């Protein structure tokens, strides 16, 4: 009597998990779907993503007695939670125990060849912005002086009406004093002449 049981053939292309397969067509489709799912699609040219990668760098801020966490966050455009997370602060009062804080700043990093190369180096990730308190007013003062000097050179000098009126008033006052002095001298000379004439007339009559 012949044996009619199905013969299990070994899989020629590497086999399945146990080395044999009952449905080679279905297994090939499953392997194909798994391979397509695990394969990362690449995009080239204009089909690539235009969104630039974001990188987080830190700026060192030197603390002063008047600094507050809210003021620092508003100055750099970040949230207080980001500053706390970057410096591992548990409360806002802990900033007075430090000399400086690391401020997280998110910046776009330029890339070459779809992310294969980066223009920014890790050495440039941290930027030191600490400066002494005496240097900041000096820089601000020099900046204002330069602005004032440039404004003076670009614009003609125009005197205000108050200065002109004060100068005119002083000139008029000097002129009035001079005229009154001349008038007083003239009156005095006329009185002297009149007195001399009356004295001469009296002496002639006698």
From Swiss-Prot:
Cited InterPro entries: LYSM1-4 (IPR045030), LysM_dom (IPR018392), LysM_dom_sf (IPR036779)
Comp. bias (Basic and acidic residues): 186-197
Annotated stretches, region: Disordered: 184-206
Domain LysM: 59-103
UniProt feature coiled coil, ranges: none
Gene3D superfamilies (alphabetical): LysM domain (3.10.350.10)
Domain of life: Eukaryota
Protein name per UniProt: LysM and putative peptidoglycan-binding domain-containing protein 2
Phylogenetic placement of the source organism: Eukaryota, Metazoa, Chordata, Craniata, Vertebrata
